Amino acid sequence: ADAPCSGQSLLAKGIPNPGCFHAAATGGNAKRQRGILLAALQCLVPGGFLLYTTCTYAPEENERNVLYLLKRHPELETVSVPELEPFHSGLTEEACYRLMPFHGAGAGGFTCLLHKKGEKPPLPPLADELLAWPIHTMNSQVS
């Protein structure tokens, strides 16, 4: 989920973004992001992954949203990404990463990989109608 955010990293690109640090902007975006994340979690099967990213520096839009999810969904856990460990957020012990402009990795942003604990259920069998679908007919029309 690349959630809409206050876009504080736009400033590092030289793009004006008035009000991006205002509490109303960061708080409103954090609330909207939580709604998006909660909806995304409903689509996540056990054993599935959700990558959460923003292009902002605001903790309420980043680490605090992750902690919000973990508190309400004990079946979730953060996943350590070894390649990102140099960018581990100092604001939480969870596996959250902040890439800042001074790291040389662009204008900055935040990311966290979430995992829903459990085994993936087996895929249901395909319906007979799908198995009987005439793929060969479509292939002959393409050639």
Regions found by a protein language model. Give the residues of each.
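SAM-dependent transferase fold signal centered on methyltransferase-like domains
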Residues: A1-S143
